[in-house]
Amino acid sequence: MMKSYLLGIDIGTSACKVAVFDKEGRVLAAANGDYPVYYPQEGWAEQNPEEWWSAVCRATKETVQKAGIAPAEIAGVGIDGQSWSAIALDKEGKVLTNTPIWMDTRAQDICERLNKEIGEDKIFEVAGNSLQPSYTTAKIIWYKENLPEVYEKIDKILQSNSFIAFKLTGAITQDMSQGYGLHCFDMKKGCWDEEMCRRLGIPMEFLPEICECDHIVGTVTAKAAAECGLAEGTPVVAGGLDAACGTLGAGVIHPGETQEQGGQAGGMSICIDEYKADPRLILGYHVIPGKWLLQGGTTGGGGVMRWFEREFADYERMMKQQTGASSLNQLNEIAEKINPGSDGVVFLPYMSGERSPIWNPYAKGVFYGLDFAKTKGHMVRACMEGVALSLRHNLEVAEAAGANAEVLRAMGGSANSLLWTQIKSDITGKPIVVPASDTATTLGAALLAGVGVGLYKDYDEAVSITVKETRRHEPNPENKEVYDKTYETYLELYKSLAHMMTK
């Protein structure tokens, strides 16, 4: 039987997505599987990895059935996943507790203590990243200090994609691109640093062996095949970080090429071919061997608009029932009627603390500039602009660190909004290309499998065959001039309020 199809699995924050692609990158079928985020306390955000697996099984069965292909026709499986999990497994492979996810900041005190005890510079020298509560490192220490009954049973710590690979194959692995979540990972050498493990208090035996993202870690077991509907023996590659796989799926594989992320969280990833680190940013390995990604990330990406729609769009939801027009599209329409700069309304998108470049887990979302003349449209447009202003902030820091961001390649749900994409182009002053596929992240995971099993000879071939452009946005110079002033206000606003955004 001809094996010419690839399956990509994306472990997102609110749902998984599974898609089957042909060799040309066309989607035969796709399905989602939802799961909750739990917020037990302020600053906490956690998920049950077994709920990820259940959702993956449901979505995989549905996808393969809708694709109308035999499971045995799938040549390989690739997995991408959200960052900075701390999935604690015992010796039998049982999940011991819910994992804190990327937006969880419960370990802030631990980070402050470790930075003082070890030294911020010494940690940064090894890891290429500052120690923040969002990362995996402090979450492991948090287990030790707050859940000793869990900690004493830990055999291995996994990331989101490596957990799904484990469920599919039984193999325990750690891919290169997710290594950056642990500050005992040497970002220059691409291996665990035993001395930093000791100083951080992380046992080396907790850490799986490092492998490349396109490495075949195993094949689908009989048990997994029965649960998810794939064929026993199907090769599975290690996969990688969702942002890095999305970067590949958007066609970003050479230095200077940049991916703009518009999913639940926002941000950017610039491809570089040499080590460049800045404590205000995030440095990780690309899913492509020999490349790094200099990244910036805001907690408030597309999630900002979903929050606004949920809390303030009762009228739009009512109209949706009458007209069928989605409430988000209606919000886009009212925002489009507002002038660039939202007539002075500025929004700080720090809805769950903030990551780069300010790294403040206590930062809060702020609307500034409201008066009786302002409307819902002003607030909607300000939300879009606030996320774009954060993107510009990250890009400017990255370029100051020596990276070169030329054209941005947009991915994620917000790329479907012509208005929002144009706002990002105007604010950053960068052209933005939108790939034809709206499944760049899942496609990137599938391409890892395609290269891993030999369906493509290399990543240049894979991208040239599968990644197409659907539209291009050029920055409007007049709007850019307005936004330059808005950006100054944005920076000054946080600077003025930062002393209030503390524990």
Model region roles, listed by residue range:
Residues 7-8, 20, 49, 108, ...:
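Active-site core segments that coordinate phosphate-bearing ligands/cofactors
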Residues 33-35, 212, 475:
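Active-site donor-binding loop signature of nucleotide-sugar glycosyltransferases
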Residues 41-42, 95-98, 175, 293-294, ...:
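Short small-residue beta-strand/loop micro-motif enriched in glycine and branched aliphatics
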Residues 1-97, 125, 153, 225-226, ...:
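N-terminal glycine/serine-rich phosphate-binding loop of ATP-dependent small-molecule kinases
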Residues 65-102, 130-136, 161, 165-185, ...:
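Short beta-strand-loop/turn "lid" adjacent to the catalytic site in phosphate-handling enzymes
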Residues 36-39, 105-107, 302-303:
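A short local loop/turn or secondary-structure capping micro-motif enriched for an aromatic residue
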